[in-house]
Amino acid sequence: MQVSLDRLPLGIPAVVLQVGCKQELRCRLRDFGLVPGTEVVTRYRSPDRGVTALEFRDTVIALRTRDLKGVRVEWK
């Protein structure tokens, strides 16, 4: 099943298919290592859903949930 990364349920592994964000954000995500083919797991969402913690490449980072809408992933 394909969804945007902001809608991926907690704890479900997925693979990044596309990073379709604005150039500046796309570069930032690429610098973190979030590129097509990367396996990612959503680990935490703040109570107001404004921040999401992601685990990928042995790292956990927290990003604004709204910034993840342009990232398409496929559940395994």
Regions found by a protein language model. Give the residues of each.
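Intrinsically disordered, low-complexity, charged/polar segments
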Residues: 4, 17, 73-76
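Short alpha-helix capping/helix-loop boundary micro-motifs
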Residues: 24-28
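A structural micro-motif recognizing beta-strand termini
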Residues: 18-22
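PDZ/PDZ-like peptide-tail recognition elements
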Residues: 1-7, 62-65
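C-terminal structural segments of small proteins and small subunits
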Residues: 45-76
